[in-house]
Amino acid sequence: MKIKTRFAPSPTGYLHVGGARTALYSWLFARNHGGEFVLRIEDTDLERSTPEAIEAIMDGMNWLNLEWDEGPYYQTKRFDRYNAVIDQMLEEGTAYKCYCSKERLEALREEQMAKGEKPRYDGRCRHSHEHHADDEPCVVRFANPQEGSVVFDDQIRGPIEFSNQELDDLIIRRTDGSPTYNFCVVVDDWDMEITHVIRGEDHINNTPRQINILKALKAPVPVYAHVSMINGDDGKKLSKRHGAVSVMQYRDDGYLPEALLNYLVRLGWSHGDQEIFTREEMIKYFALNAVSKSASAFNTDKLLWLNHHYINALPPEYVATHLQWHIEQENIDTRNGPQLADLVKLLGERCKTLKEMAQSCRYFYEDFAEFDADAAKKHLRPVARQPLEVVRDKLTAITDWTAENVHHAIQATADELEVGMGKVGMPLRVAVTGAGQSPALDVTVHAIGKTRSIERINKALAFIAERENQQ
């Protein structure tokens, strides 16, 4: 049997991390078994579904590189199929037309609640032999079995049982002729030959209804696995107030897809004590029986730690392809300065996100208008004039511009003036970067370039001279 899973989001908003984790688990399970992964857009909610949301879901899936083998299928393009199946069920007697008014149903609901009963349809039209005109408005209900129970072996939670007496006669077609969500899902899983349904725990109560419809259609019943919810670090359900919850927001905030995937796979699944997983390792080791039943707590600090790891562990050339987008957001012209892959090597240890890297690299490519006020006040003082003049001359004399030779020039300046490296290094750092912090000074000066570094030292010397004149 070929394993076939699906990810079936509703396009009413962005792809959030809970949905992304569900997609990842479904994708990994299919890949682990050499199966296929289907993308299905469940857009039956015509009022809330938007093209923008569909695009956002696709963007998120593509950014995470969760490629699908089939689809995307759209439920709104399959209404003829759903209605054909409903008509077949009406003929076979597994569904029936219900003409009860909203007023009657509301009165029934209030009466049941007043008695402390669970609100449910009383089956009036199921047993009715009244004649109705063909054009009289009605819904179609599934004739749910009234005896026995539904039992399914959830691959994460174990056996789950529902009494059929607890289940309503579900509406499967509305008065406007449109099929309902729970019914469309059943027909889709049947037609697309889905073998394993991996989805959020909020769908557990839908499962017995869907199984009963599948059995009425004499269709195979897939295996189900319901993943627990994700909470914020305060124990409450993850929401916007916990920070970014959209996958693409994490992209915008400077996270790598590898970091988010690694974090999400461990958010409820484990393989021993291993924390870092390549995509290949995730596929190799993933198993549903290792997924936790308990809710997981989202920890942004842990995600940040993973992101920092991947910035430094992945090939700089690859990280640079993701950094490019952030550079563009900052409107930095990188034509004059180090290659982005070299920038990743320079700033990788200091920066935990690519956004932070893009925001702290401008001095490598563009001249700055003024020095950081605090750094200049502390380090661009008259006492720094001589170290800057000497190191400028030694840098000017370099014929082979390498980081090693830059280091020698700085060291030689300190030796000649008989001062510590800090007496040379700190004024030089502020002079060439405009700030008080940077990567190692030799590689920083080397990356900025000889001509630009010397010009900036001269600018710093002019700043010191002006400062002296004002005193």
Swiss-Prot record:
InterPro entries: aa-tRNA-synth_I_cd-bd (IPR045462), aa-tRNA-synth_I_codon-bd_sub2 (IPR020751), aa-tRNA-synth_I_CS (IPR001412), aa_tRNA-synth_I_cd-bd_sf (IPR008925), Glu-tRNA-ligase_bac/mito (IPR004527), Glu/Gln-tRNA-synth (IPR000924), Glu/Gln-tRNA-synth_Ib_cat-dom (IPR020058), GluQ/Sye (IPR049940)
Binding site for ATP: K240
Cofactor dependence: Zn(2+)
Keywords: Aminoacyl-tRNA synthetase, ATP-binding, Cytoplasm, Ligase, Metal-binding, Nucleotide-binding, Protein biosynthesis, Zinc
Short motif 'KMSKS' region, span: 237-241
Biological process according to GO: glutamyl-tRNA aminoacylation
Catalytic activity as recorded in UniProt: tRNA(Glu) + L-glutamate + ATP = L-glutamyl-tRNA(Glu) + AMP + diphosphate
Residues holding Zn(2+): C98, C100, C125, H127
EC number: 6.1.1.17
Protein name (Swiss-Prot/TrEMBL): Glutamate--tRNA ligase
Originating species: Escherichia coli O6:K15:H31 (strain 536 / UPEC)
